[in-house]
């Protein structure tokens, strides 16, 4: 795992599993989940090219990931992120400019990449300030074990999605 990745390896495994489940679900958001999985595979070296630009740099550095995040963000906000701004960001980061490749990935997949890289980098200018994973992750105890529905007080008549968030659990 690259040293610049802020979330733990366990959180990355959880996100990968949740995204794969979302992709396989009949009504899941497949493009977003595909973008999430693509970003995780690229960052860990399991995919050789950037998911949005096709940039071939490996290993992925924080600067390269930030440039890819800019490109992913531009896919969903093309009118708000002109090409000159992407080029300027790459220059500031000291990496080569690679434009978003609309034939490589669709905008919803690009948004999943943007969300994921923002979170991995804890990029303040990114999706939700880089502090929120792109999909809800399972809650865990300090020892890493998963919190059960019984421990959350989720009954058969109460959906698991109404369970308190990690942040709420940490405050309590």
Placement of each model-derived feature along the sequence:
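Compositionally biased accessory segments in Actinobacterial proteins
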Residues: 1-172
